[in-house]
């Protein structure tokens, strides 16, 4: 069987991945808190772990991999957003959850096998907290229940490589008079009548952030599973606290064997910030006409453990490359394809996506279009709606883009069938409507030109078929 090697944050080494059960490979990735649009940085872990999910399915079989990514739908940020907008909390979370799914779908991400909402697992959280209290790892104080870090002191901080004393001195923690130790963190907090709350042995309240992932992963994957992933910013305190809770509540297990963390994202060499004017949501870029596949390509062009810099230049280069590759692989729809061994070697070496992309460049140069298509598919970069139609020079609806895309397919089909009379007829008609169907130097279809005959409409393009 193919060997996968992954960098394990827990051991700080690249290790051979050996699943607990090859017939039931299990992965948990921390998902979003649903109160706003996903920004560009939120998209990176989704794409990274989507590629890992695809690789695991390739190696172990789609029916033998379980991927869980949660939604945090109870949180003080959500409460604040609902109050700010004067809308019910449930409306905010439902709307934002769908936004996230739509935007990540546009980035080519497969939906995980399970997408639990925190509010669906409150009883499991209460049960885990009760277990921690009973075992002396948690205590009640002024309506709160807190995890006692001193009860796990010899292990706490190993993931992030910090000592408890150093963390007390320098970490950002909530200091409250009811804490026995400044590092103790909230498992349960009281709720006022205007905030979401559930009945519990400690009164009406709501869970802390960290207990949510521990309870959901235990319920869906068990006390021991293979991989836990997330952004580097979650390593401390979130992942550190998850380990403490889960291992203390279920000492018979060892929680996650492998921990993977992706690095952060910059924009044009600077930290993404609203104050700098370089803060983008995924939807912002999609609405600017940047295809989701292009965003994904830029993400994958940098190794997941290195900081990534989003630039306009990279986006343009990615688009040109993808359109060329899509043109080369267009006639292969009915062929049986499989990725090249070198492509798989790159991905199995700690998700070396830049190396995998370099292999795709080689395959294109060597005219191995079947392996190129297979590699694109495995990276989630196969063509979708935007096939062959370069960026419009004007604001273009999805409907117009799809109609132009259909013309491109028909034109190429005529050419491939050597029906040059019909190909020429369609080319001339399309040109009059504002779409130049000649092949560009990048291998794609030339842009529709507003200078030819204005912006084409769907009806005009449909009439050409």
Swiss-Prot record:
Q: How is the cofactor bound?
A: Binds 1 zinc ion per subunit.
Q: Which cofactor does it need?
A: Zn(2+)
Q: Which UniProt keywords apply?
A: Aminoacyl-tRNA synthetase, ATP-binding, Cytoplasm, Ligase, Metal-binding, Nucleotide-binding, Protein biosynthesis, Zinc
Positions of short motif 'KMSKS' region: 271-275
Mind telling me which GO cellular component terms the entry cites?
Answer: cytosol
GO BP annotations of the record are: cysteinyl-tRNA aminoacylation
Q: Which InterPro entries match?
A: Cys-tRNA-ligase, Cys-tRNA-synt_Ia_DALR, Cys-tRNA/MSH_ligase, Rossmann-like_a/b/a_fold, tRNA-synt_1_cat_dom, tRNAsynth_Ia_anticodon-bd
Catalytic activity, reaction form: tRNA(Cys) + L-cysteine + ATP = L-cysteinyl-tRNA(Cys) + AMP + diphosphate
One short Pfam family name for this protein? tRNA-synt_1e
Q: What CDD domains does its record include?
A: CysRS_core
Sequence positions that bind Zn(2+): 30, 213, 238, 242
| E.C. number(s) listed in UniProt | 6.1.1.16
Q: Which residues bind ATP?
A: 274
Q: Name one GO molecular function term.
A: ATP binding
Q: Where is this motif: 'HIGH' region?
A: 32-42
EC main class here is: ligase
- Where does the record place it? Cytoplasm
NCBIfam families reported for this sequence: cysS
According to its UniProt record, which protein family does this protein belong to? Belongs to the class-I aminoacyl-tRNA synthetase family.
The entry describes its oligomerization and partners as: Monomer.
Q: What is this protein called?
A: Cysteine--tRNA ligase
Species name: Ruegeria pomeroyi (strain ATCC 700808 / DSM 15171 / DSS-3)
């Amino acid at each position: 069987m193919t060997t996968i090697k992954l960098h394990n944050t827990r051991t700080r080494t690249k290790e051979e991945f050996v699943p607990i059960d090859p017939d039931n490979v299990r992965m948990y990735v921390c998902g979003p808190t649903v109160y706003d649009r996903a920004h560009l940085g939120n998209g990176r872990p989704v794409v990274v772990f989507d590629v890992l999910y695809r690789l695991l399915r390739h190696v172990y079989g789609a029916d033998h991999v379980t991927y869980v990514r949660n939604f945090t739908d109870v949180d003080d940020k959500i409460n604040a957003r609902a109050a700010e907008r004067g809308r019910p909390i449930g409306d905010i979370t439902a709307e934002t959850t769908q936004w996230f799914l739509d935007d990540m779908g546009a980035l080519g991400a497969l939906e995980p096998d399970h997408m639990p909402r925190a509010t669906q697992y409150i009883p499991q959280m209460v049960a885990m907290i009760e277990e921690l209290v009973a075992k002396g790892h948690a205590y009640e104080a002024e309506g709160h229940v807190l995890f006692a870090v001193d009860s796990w002191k010899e292990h706490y901080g190993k993931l992030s490589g910090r000592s408890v004393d150093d963390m007390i001195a320098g970490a950002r923690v909530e200091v409250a008079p009811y804490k026995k130790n400044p590092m103790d963190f909230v498992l349960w907090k009281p709720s006022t009548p205007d905030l979401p709350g559930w009945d519990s042995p400690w009164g009406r309240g709501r869970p802390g952030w960290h207990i949510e992932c521990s309870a959901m992963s235990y319920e869906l994957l068990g006390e021991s599973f293979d991989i836990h992933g997330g952004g580097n910013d979650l390593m401390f305190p979130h992942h550190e606290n998850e380990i403490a809770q889960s291992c203390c509540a279920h000492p018979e297990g060892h929680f996650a064997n492998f921990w993977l963390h992706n690095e952060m994202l910059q924009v044009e060499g600077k930290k993404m910030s609203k104050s700098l004017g370089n803060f983008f949501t995924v939807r912002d870029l999609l609405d600017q006409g940047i295809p989701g596949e292009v965003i994904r390509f830029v993400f994958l062009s940098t190794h997941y453990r290195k900081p990534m810099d989003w630039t306009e230049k990279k986006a343009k280069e990615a688009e040109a490359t993808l359109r060329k590759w899509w043109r080369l692989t267009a006639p292969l729809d009915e062929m049986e394809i499989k990725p090249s061994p070198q492509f798989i070697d790159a991905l199995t070496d700690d998700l070396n996506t830049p190396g995998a992309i370099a292999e795709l460049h080689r395959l294109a140069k060597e005219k191995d279009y079947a392996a190129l298509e297979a590699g694109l598919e495995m990276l989630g970069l196969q063509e979708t709606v935007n096939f062959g139609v370069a960026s419009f020079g004007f604001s273009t609806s999805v409907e117009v883009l799809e109609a132009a895309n259909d013309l491109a397919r028909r034109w190429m089909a005529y050419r491939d069938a050597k029906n040059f009379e019909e190909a020429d007829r369609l080319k001339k008609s399309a040109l009059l409507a504002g779409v130049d169907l000649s092949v560009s130097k990048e291998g794609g279809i030339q842009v529709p030109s507003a200078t030819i005959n204005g912006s084409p409409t769907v009806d005009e393009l449909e009439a050409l078929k």
